[in-house]
Amino acid sequence: MQSPLSLRHFARKPLVRAMQPLLLSLGLAGALPSLASAASLEIGAESRRQSFDIPAGSLEAALNQFGREAGVLLSFSPELTAGRQTQGLHGQFGVDEGLQQLLAGSGLHAVAQDGGYSLQSSGAALEVDRQVVVGSRAPTSISELPGTVWIIESAQLQEQTKGGVPFKEALGQLIPGLDVGPQGRTNFGQNMRGRSALVMIDGVSLNSSRGISRQFDSIDPFNVERIEVLSGASAVYGGGATGGIINIVTKKGEAGAARFNSEVGLRSGFETSQDHDWRVAQSVSGGSEQVKGRASVAYQKNGAAYDGSGDQVMLDITQTDLQYNQSVDVMGSLDFAFANGHSLSLGAQWYDSGYDGDKGVDLGRNFSALRGQEPFEIEGGASFDREPRTERTQFNATYHAPEVLGHDLYLQTYYRSEEMAFQPYPSIAFTGTGAINPGRSYYSASQQDTDYYGLKAVLVKEWDRFTLTYGADIERESFDSDQALFDLGTAAQTGGLVADEYAKVGRYPGIDTDSDSLFAQGSWKATDALTLSGGVRRQRTNNEVGDFVAAAQQIQISKGNGTSADAIPGGEKDYQVDLYNFGAVYKLNKAQQVWANYSEGFELPDPAKYYGQGTYSAAPVNGHWVLQKGVNVEDSALDGIKTKQVELGWRHYDGALDAQLAAFYAWSDKSITYNRATLLVEQLDSKKRNYGLEGQANYWLTDNWQVGTSALAIRSQQKIDDRWEKQDVTAASPSKLTAFVGWQDGDTSLRLQGVRTFNLSDDGNVLANGQFDGKDHKIDGYAVFDLLGSQALPVGTLNFGIQNLLDKDYTTVWGQRAQVFYSANIPAELFDYHGRGRTYSLSYSVEF
């Protein structure tokens, strides 16, 4: 598993690589008309009447039976019919009349198209009847879910992103329980309800055993149809969702003639000629109700960013930056609708986001800025043999088959491969005279690769008042990493601006993770108003850790100090956990419900940063470093952490008021901390809890004016010496408040919005012995405002925006956390990442 001395060259690939998947997708899209023709059925029975005897019950089962008996092709998305009932069909009917009878009261209607029929929403359903899969693995009405569910529609997201708000920041604005977003590449610390979230694209997890926080550096918002959010601990989709689930649903093709969507945009603070970001995106979709597809490419190029004082924002050399960055997102999808409700959806994505410039942080000649001898500056002339970058390839196929032994069957198979490279980072030790100590110093950048694939199978059986959802998940993941070492003399002479690679060594031990799960979820409509639900998930996870020579010893060997070293033993560890949930939803009326639930989530915190640590002899013995003690599987295995949560909530949706409010309390018996010297994980046997309120309310004052607000009021604590103390600010979530006022009048819309994050403090770092070190920290809150707008033109739409309307100069939450993490041996100014100042955005989009 571990090959620490080998490394693939991580060179920038040309844009032509991005075009290859696009050309393939365009070829598939071009074949849609012929594929649709082959899939179409000739129907000649529209006017013929025949006898039917279809019982009342599941609408989807009734439609499938009707299609078989009538000999007609019915095309519909399973999300449309999930959870809906029919009164049945008995007697003599024609096709049109029979469909009308079956669909009565469902909010759906049938449309004759391409020799068959397709189902469409009549638009009469309330928001609470929206179908989502995030809460129960199969399409379910929000009104039946005992939990906090949010849906971010494409129009809401596009209003933000076309107005210039970056994706991570837009999510923090639109999802009440999600922390405000950082402005660099990382989304570390952007928690939900104070804990980590499971992020997915079309149901495929973006989380990995190695906790690299780049889940939102994964897709261009041009390709997002909607975002489904379930707040709080959940085991519905497996591990990692101790704070909630965010499922990013991508855009699909639409039936009909080929349709094109074009978008261009520009963003600038007008501080210098380099202060600009620009983007361009293009998609094509089309087909029939039987076969349809979409292909797209989105490209963005970023320049420099400046804060509210007119100074350039410091480049993030810890988790990497998005200044001087370019990204390409290529996506393609095909959707097939077969007879009797069967469907197949295929999706593919290639995403590449990385550094593309010649600027870097000047650390001073001989790294003098690291000693506080001179300020850190951003200068030209940067040349790195390894550049910060995220590259991801993902494929998935989803098949739906109704009437499989009386069940609905959902099958999904998927594959994800990603490579993540980091910025060159200085680990420099100085002598008493201020000279560099070469034996204890190095300049390096890591690369971390993950391959992830699996299969999900879900069966749904509906009776009159009871629905059973059960199935299995199979997941396989392989993680490997390495570290490029750069010539120390060259780096010192250039202030770190030139990184010439001379060796490659291991960074973390290799980790293979296998996970197999069985789950079952039941829902019972005890009355027309009361729905009870409950479920269990049994998950078995196997971690196989490779033997690993500690990174520090590999670096010493690369310097010629020794020729070999003992490996810290690897090994295997099995985890088996049972996770339960149960809840109740009571419908006060058609527009509102109250609910209560208990749920559990599970996570295995970053085994790569836990294992592979060791203490060696002070010097090599006959050229060999002798291991004295190490963190290994046999002697100090990492424990999984189970999070439990209780929640009470209320939601209300009608024509004027949309509101949702939940009170939650989550707790776990273990927690983790980060060693400030090594930045590695240490496990604590101390309890941790989060509790608070999450809510949102939007109200239409008139047909033109809307106001709204959302809030997360949260407190995060850990138990030290039988007392509840404040949790470390690097992991706790600050409370948050958002508000907006919007106006629209036909073709014009305006929105003024603000977000306020509140102060957060702790009592110091928690050490491995469970005690505080006495160095307390504080994160200062701040408030920023944006003005967004749009104007429909005779052809297309113009969107515009001003971010940070008041040009406030502030340090982001991540910038303040980074100073806590990294400033033990380096001046904090290097990690003082400010927010971007007043920035103007303009974009134009057109569909044709």
Region annotations inferred by a language model:
Residues 169, 189, 204-231, 282:
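Short acidic/polar hinge/loop motifs at secondary-structure boundaries
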Residues 602, 756-765, 790-848:
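C-terminal beta-signal and adjacent terminal beta-strands/loops
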